[in-house]
Amino acid sequence: MNGTTQNNAALFDGGVFSPYLTSRLPYWAGVRQNVVGSTVDGRPVAPANSSTLTYATIGPSPLDTAAAAAASAAASTARSMAADFSFYNHLASNAVTRTAVREDILTVMLAKLETLTAQLEELSQKVEELADATTHTPAQPVTQ
């Protein structure tokens, strides 16, 4: 980050490392939607630095200074997150936990299916035995 002061205002030049800023804007926002990337005002950005957007203040007002400071903080945070994977560890551990829970649920469902299959086979055998018993018995004459 570079900063200078002029007329009681701080001016910052900084970068925010995020393709999210241009790739997620709708077409009507005036930002070119292309694979190369684009700056906020629509100018193309070379692939080597397509994820870098430069922010600079427009005039010496407190609002511009606050915007530049926010952009600088965002850039610093983005660089920290890119360099330090501890920000993402809880996401990875949650994903592992969800996967383990899904595997446990699938194991329980598989066991229930195996039990149902065994019960169905047993029921099929009983039905077959009853069918054989009723078809092989000689017919009894009906007397009145």
Swiss-Prot record:
Gene Ontology molecular function: hexon binding
Gene Ontology cellular component annotations, sorted alphabetically: host cell nucleus; viral capsid, decoration
Predominant subcellular localization, coarse grouping: virion
Keywords, comma-separated and alphabetical: Capsid decoration protein, Capsid protein, Coiled coil, Host nucleus, Host-virus interaction, Virion, Virus entry into host cell
Induction notes from the record: Expressed in the intermediate phase of the viral replicative cycle.
One Pfam family of this chain: Adeno_PIX
Superkingdom assignment: Viruses
Keyword Coiled coil: yes
Other known facts: This protein is only encoded by mastadenoviruses, and may therefore play a role in mammals tropism.
Similarity field: Belongs to the adenoviridae hexon-interlacing protein family.
Self-association and partners: Homotrimer. Interacts with hexon protein; this interaction tethers the hexons together. Self-interacts with adjacent proteins. Interacts with kinesin light chain KLC1; this interaction leads to capsid disruption at the nuclear pore complex during virus entry into host cell.
Purpose: Structural component of the virion that acts as a cement protein on the capsid exterior and forms triskelion structures consisting of three molecules that stabilize three hexon trimers at the center of each icosahedral facet and fixes the peripentonal hexons. Dispensable for assembly. During virus entry, recruits the anterograde motor kinesin-1 to the capsid docked at the nuclear pore complex thereby subjecting the docked capsid to a pulling force.
Protein name, per record: Hexon-interlacing protein
Species: Human adenovirus A serotype 12 (HAdV-12)
